[in-house]
């Protein structure tokens, strides 16, 4: 039995995620296998609007946005694994555990996010996420998302 991996371009990502500029933080999906894992890329540009204030003279990609990029990657994996949502449904970011930041991400870096499906329990799906730059871990966390109807 062979396992089939897939890629996604930005146009396909936009069809799946509700996020838009400047908050769409996944540029391309390099590979994924449904219900297993996904590897995606965020190209970090000095033109990102938050670099004006974070930090002037020493721009650093905000850690919370690294987590958000990984959460968006989990959303893509969930959409591709479970299928399209019913009208009025969304995937919500439901929680995060064990988040650790190992080194800064700066303009010019290419951040690779790898998220791995762990389990679904009581409507929550848990994923392990790791972000790297040049093969070195910059952040890791366990994230949960839930499929729910809009309020």
UniProtKB/Swiss-Prot annotation:
Going by the entry's taxonomy, the superkingdom of the source organism is recorded as Bacteria
The Gene Ontology CC terms held by the record are: cytoplasm; membrane
Q: What class of enzyme is it?
A: lyase
Catalytic reaction annotation: a (3R)-hydroxyacyl-[ACP] = a (2E)-enoyl-[ACP] + H2O
- Residues at the catalytic site: 54
Q: What is its EC number?
A: 4.2.1.59
Family that this chain belongs to = Belongs to the thioester dehydratase family. FabZ subfamily.
The record's function comment reads: Involved in unsaturated fatty acids biosynthesis. Catalyzes the dehydration of short chain beta-hydroxyacyl-ACPs and long chain saturated and unsaturated beta-hydroxyacyl-ACPs.
Could you identify this protein by its name? 3-hydroxyacyl-[acyl-carrier-protein] dehydratase FabZ
| Native organism | Erwinia tasmaniensis (strain DSM 17950 / CFBP 7177 / CIP 109463 / NCPPB 4357 / Et1/99)
